[in-house]
């Protein structure tokens, strides 16, 4: 059961009226109010029931250190309420004002080299910094106190797409060393666990630890990524606790999750939230084919480079990942309105007729209770000026708006089905530790011979597509979400289990053996359990813990130069 208790499906778009407040007039020269009124008329006619606002404009809320401007949003919320539209209001901490960088240089995020991140982008701060949180607290508090009682507000988004980058500030590195002291107790314990005799890397003291910029040790890498994920989670929990004290009963707290951001553990982030909200961006046009057709060599997929997977199964996989974050239904706070291009990553692939509605219905079938597009207005400026919204640059309704309205009708037609719980005959263990390990030492290779950092996701989709093609539902469950004490119950619930865990604990491997002994059908992908959770290779005969049970083992493995059919289907 989700934290919110609304009935039916919700539908809408992110709405950034503030981006147009200095430029919008109609043909008669009227002010912004005319444009705003037209927007809400179009929203109401198209079936919008939710908008998301306010999360990207800290400088609009707080133009100067001691000056706040809070009233500009009220007319938008009033009009939303008058039209029966609920609002998710965001805290603006992911896009910081220039004055923060100038007045507080110590909060600027650092690259691995130690150089500060240049201004001009977003998510460019060290959010573990006490000083940064002290800057965040007043603007968060002012916004929430001002609008928590507004009748349009249904929920709050804290930050946005957290974990975008790895942080390398001195304070982050110091807290990393402290975490290693806590985990290993002594420097001898760390030296032994990580095998630091190799290449003369043994340390005299934790203060001797090298910076991550020069690291080549897999155990260091996994510990560093785990620490980054912990910092992201702590920042969200800090914001959640601050906001929780101020909001009205019945309002939920979420964040917009971009799955598998570098500084985040996707399957632990839900512990900080009342409800899961995600980006569901997918390849359109031929990128929604099934079975998945990989692009020809040298030809890019019909999606931005940061959408790593294509095919109809990839859309389902994203949704099942979203549902796995809290093992419950979820909200889609961003998805393709039209082409999704940003800066140098161009991907002008607007939907084929019918795909807009097809994708939305697909999301709902996998547990989405809100489908919200990014965004309402296509922007005339900024790096996302080619990111198509529901309305084009002209702000005149066109084909996308018509598809948007048509999809709302289709969703209303299935509201009577109630809260849908997707079927899941197959379970897949999702291992974030393995994702990180494969980014460094992946099982797959690129055409240039280098490791494919998307090895984990590509293998996951191949496994997922087998179930998808067979018409079987899939449940993704994080390695830390399993009840390792009840393999018998898990086998009764899930007839098949795919253990997609290159890095695995002894307890997880024992659970999988007990699951199979209880009658479950256990599937082991390549290199299952090959390393421990700390990245050190297991020395048992592979597959570790399963050779005797399977009656099969291996000592060698090979990359493939081209696909090879193992058997005919």
Where on the chain are the PLM-derived regions?
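Short, well-ordered coil/turn segments that N-cap beta-strands
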Residues: 6-11, 47-49, 81-87, 149-154, ...
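The substrate-binding groove and active-site-proximal loops of carbohydrate-active enzymes
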Residues: 11-32, 54-71, 118-137, 159-166, ...
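Short, acidic/polar
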Residues: 21-45, 136-142, 258-268, 351-362, ...
């Amino acid at each position: 059961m989700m934290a919110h208790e609304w009935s039916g499906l919700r539908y809408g778009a992110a709405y950034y009226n503030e981006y147009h407040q200095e430029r919008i007039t109609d043909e008669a020269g009227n002010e912004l109010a005319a444009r705003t009124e037209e927007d809400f008329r179009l929203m109401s006619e198209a079936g919008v029931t939710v908008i998301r606002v306010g999360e990207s404009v800290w400088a609009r809320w707080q133009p100067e250190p001691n000056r706040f401007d809070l009233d500009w949003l009220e007319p938008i919320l009033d009009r939303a309420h008058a039209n029966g539209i609920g609002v998710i209001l965001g805290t603006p901490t992911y896009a910081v004002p220039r004055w923060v960088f100038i007045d507080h240089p110590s909060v600027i995020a650092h690259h691995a080299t130690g150089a500060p991140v240049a201004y001009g982008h977003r998510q460019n701060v060290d959010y573990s910094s006490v000083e940064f949180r002290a800057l965040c607290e007043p603007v968060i508090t002012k916004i929430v106190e001002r609008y928590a009682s507004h009748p349009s507000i249904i929920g709050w988004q804290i930050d946005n797409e957290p974990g975008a980058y790895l942080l390398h500030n001195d304070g982050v590195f110091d807290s990393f060393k402290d975490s290693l002291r806590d985990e290993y107790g002594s420097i001898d314990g760390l030296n032994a666990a990580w095998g630091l005799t190799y290449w003369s890397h043994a340390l005299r003291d934790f203060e001797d630890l090298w910076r991550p910029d020069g690291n080549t040790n897999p155990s260091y890498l996994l510990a560093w990524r785990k620490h980054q994920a912990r910092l992201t989670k702590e920042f969200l929990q800090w914001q959640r606790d601050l906001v929780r004290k101020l909001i009205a009963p019945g309002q939920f707290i979420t964040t917009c999750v971009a799955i598998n951001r570098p500084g985040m553990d996707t399957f632990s982030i839900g512990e900080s939230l009342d409800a899961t909200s995600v980006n569901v961006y997918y390849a359109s046009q031929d990128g929604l084919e099934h079975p998945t057709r990989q692009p020809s060599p040298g030809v890019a997929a019909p999606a931005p480079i940061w959408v790593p997977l294509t095919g109809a199964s990839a859309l389902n996989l994203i949704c099942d990942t979203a549902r796995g974050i809290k093992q419950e239904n979820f909200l889609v706070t961003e998805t393709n309105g039209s082409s999704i291009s940003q800066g140098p990553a161009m991907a002008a692939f607007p939907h084929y007729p019918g795909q807009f509605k097809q994708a939305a219905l697909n999301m709902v079938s996998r547990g989405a209770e809100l489908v919200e597009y990014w965004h309402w207005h296509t922007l005339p400026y900024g790096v996302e000026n080619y990111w198509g919204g529901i309305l084009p640059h002209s702000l005149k309704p066109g084909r996308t708006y018509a598809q948007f309205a048509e999809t709302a009708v289709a969703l209303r037609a299935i509201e009577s089905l109630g809260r849908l719980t997707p079927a899941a005959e197959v379970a897949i263990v999702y291992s974030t530790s393995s994702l990180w390990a494969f980014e460094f030492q992946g099982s797959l290779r690129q055409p240039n011979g280098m490791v494919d950092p998307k090895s984990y996701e590509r293998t996951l989709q191949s496994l997922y597509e087998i179930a998808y093609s067979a018409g079987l539902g899939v449940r993704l469950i994080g390695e830390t979400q399993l009840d390792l004490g009840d393999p018998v119950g898990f086998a009764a619930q899930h007839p098949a289990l795919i253990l997609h865990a290159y890095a695995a604990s002894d307890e997880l491997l024992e659970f999988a053996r007990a699951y199979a002994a209880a009658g479950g059908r256990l599937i082991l992908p390549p290199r299952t359990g090959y390393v421990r959770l700390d990245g050190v290779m297991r020395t048992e005969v592979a597959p570790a813990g399963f050779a005797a049970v399977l009656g099969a083992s291996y000592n060698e493995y090979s990359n493939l130069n081209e696909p090879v059919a193992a058997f005919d289907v």
